[in-house]
Amino acid sequence: MRQALHALLLASLSLPTMAAPHALEEIVVEGRKTPLLGLARSASEGVVGAEDLALRPLLRPGDVLEAIPGVVVTQHSGAGKSNQLFLRGFNLDHGTDFATWVDGMPVNLRSHGHGQGYTDINFLIPEMIDQLRFVKGPYHAELGDFSSAGGVHFETRRRVEAPTVSVSAGSNGYERLLAMASRAQESVLTGALEAVRYDGPWRDVEENLEKLNGQLALTRETEAGRWRLHARGYQSRWHSADQIPARAVAEGVLHPLGALDPALGGRSHRFSLGGDGTLRTALGVWTAEAYVIDYRLRLWSNFTYGLDDPARGDQFEQLDDRRMAGGQGTFSWGEDQPLTQRLGIEVRSDVIDNVGLYRTVARQRQEGFRDDAVDQTSVALFYEGAFSLSPRWRSVFGLRADHYDFSVRAADRLNSGGARESQLSPKASLIFSPSETLEAYLSIGRGFHSNDARGVTLRIDPQSGNAADPVDPLVPSTGGELGVKWSPRPGVNSALALWQLDLDSELLFVGDAGNTEATRGSERWGVEFNNFWQLTPAWRLEVDLSWTHGRFQGNAPEGNRIPGAVPFVASSTLSYAPSQGPFATLRLRHLGAYPLAEDNTAKSRGSTLLNLALGWRWPRLRAQLDVLNALDAEDHDIDYFYASRLPGEPEEGVEDLHFKRFEPRQLRATVTLTL
């Protein structure tokens, strides 16, 4: 690994300084400074720029998602695994109802070995993010699968102003090296390389995270448009300390930072090629994006210890090995007319050679529960029209049609088969602008998420051998939002939104078990209040509040609370960032207590986390110290409530709180040199 770090450093130093080409104009992304008045289609959408992200101390790459107001990022496993996400009363698991895209490539993985919509953004290099554009709710025609709660588009930097090398070291064996550079003539060639090592603070397991990450892009811009070709490569391996039972800690058997199974962890890679382009013609604007992706994950977990197999333990492996290809094209016209229109098409094909679930001991396979191959294809057409009704009124209306084909070749032929399903999703917004500083929005729409193809064709439970009911291929949702955006002066903006989202009842495929379970329909509504103040040219403050009420529909005997539905989230970021000299950022995040059981008898107590970054900036040098979990809080990063079995416990196990603690306070120092 250290040899790789040295090679990366030498490679970065060999890149020449970029000369700015005449064909590329400078684009300044204002991020949260930009109120989007006159542009937004709903009150809760927004933009976060590179400047916003650069000020944040980050424990892991996934933490960049917390720049979206109301989003909470946690981790119940190792540093190489996808994060657990919370938004608008959803425990999104690893991304089921939140769509994520990077440079036109989808990140959510359908029919994934671990969980539907699995979203792993560990391949993102935070310093290479130019901006992220986010929306919430199912009101936007360009977003389809997994977007009921919202979605985000990451756009990475097309050029780096000067070659840059960044070296980091910190607590628990943390090491990181990053190199970025561009070379420009008629086209701009931009590359970045990253290497990371991390052992973690856990008592019984060293994470031994080793990650290599790189991206390369070639961009050319002309008067008529712009095109880009890009390539990415990411691979990592790690060990993990997963969530642990609270009773073992209370009895002194296990340390709060301990682990019961030292052989957990994973290996993953993601390689991609892609391209995108924009062409302006007399008729309108054409855009196109295309990609191919090679992805693989092997993940070892153990959540119940000895509940299913007291002799060998309950460790299991999940495998996902796939190729993806697809793209999107749009045509927009009427830019200077009262009616601006956009027509788009989106296609995607997932060829999954092997998606499996196996019983293991110390990572060695003992038997298989699922060993399948899946082909899943989707085609979508969408239309959106924005009509200026008067100087104060405008409307946006859209319609999206999605069609899915599922094909499964299962080890058990009874679970093989195919299915087709279509979904029509109307969207609409009405916007009123009483002044140049204020807009009010009313938005409604229909969305959906797809289900795991293995659940769509399921006939026999692979563990019990009993008959099983298949899941619905597509599960619809319906939502609405009423809100306002207000920007009384440049650098000050606020957004207030009252929203509701209903999901149909469904049978859900459980990737950890290979079977299905019934879930009831749900209703969620809430209020969000987001604020940004540029107090002075150097000082800025963000305060975001989110409150949610979530319940299952009906009055079942077991109760109607939604496990993992967080009722309150608050976050605030205070930054001092002059162009040179000292700088500092203080970031506070509070996650309110939330139910872990439908009858509300088990609850998470919530958590509060404070991170600090401080440093000094010179013309070509920057030194920064991150203090993560600055108060050394012992709160839980995430909580679950379920039955597990330890040695000597009854056959049916013990229902208990299972948690993963915050990582203790740690320091990370970074020196960045601009050549």
Predicted features by range, described:
Residues 62, 66-109:
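Extracytoplasmic beta-strand/coil segments of soluble accessory domains associated
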Residues 136-141, 150-183, 193, 202-203, ...:
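Short strand-turn segments of transmembrane beta-barrel domains in outer membranes
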Residues 221, 226-234, 266-411, 431-433, ...:
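Face-selective signature of the C-terminal outer-membrane beta-barrel domain
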Residues 593-597, 616-675:
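C-terminal beta-signal and adjacent terminal beta-strands/loops
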